[in-house]
Amino acid sequence: GTLTARTLAAAIGRSHEDGLAPLDYHLDLIYDLLARVLKQSGKHDPLPFEPALWADLDLMLTDAFVLLSAHLAAGRVNPETLHSDWKIKPGSVDLSTALDQAASSGDIDTALGRLRPVHQGYTDLRDALARLRELKAAGGWPTVAARQTLHPGDHGPAVGDLRFRLLASGDADLTGRIDDLLYFDSRLAAAVKRFQ
């Protein structure tokens, strides 16, 4: 019904949390069809909606679920198209079973969650993406106004900008004593290496 359609549309909308583009999964068309179905369902006609409209919505939802599931399970880009000698093979996933389970339980989020990679690297990437989006929403990265390449031993406002920028990315810290925030010391050099 429309509750499941809205639940799937919301899950597609959150696919950006996995680094995916929600519009790649027909989100705009799904919302358009869903609005038309809901509008027709509100009428008091003996036949309150067109079956073809429901069929279109069902097809779009099914295709979106299967495509999103495939991308969550195996990635959006086939690595063999980038590197012909790629050795890592993704695990096989039965997308029709995933669709059946999601449809029968109505728990779209759990069904999609089971398809995500379970290794820590994937979780770390999702967390980093969330932090970057928060940083962007807050105005973005602090800029480093350096006119030339900075080196250990340099001193000046650009060094302070660099230190602040590396603090924002989590690559530098202010624990311990720093005598001069504008001095490019060994701790800042180590932070630059971590960042790189």
State what each model feature region is:
Residues 1-195:
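Auxiliary tRNA-acceptor-end handling modules of aminoacyl-tRNA synthetases
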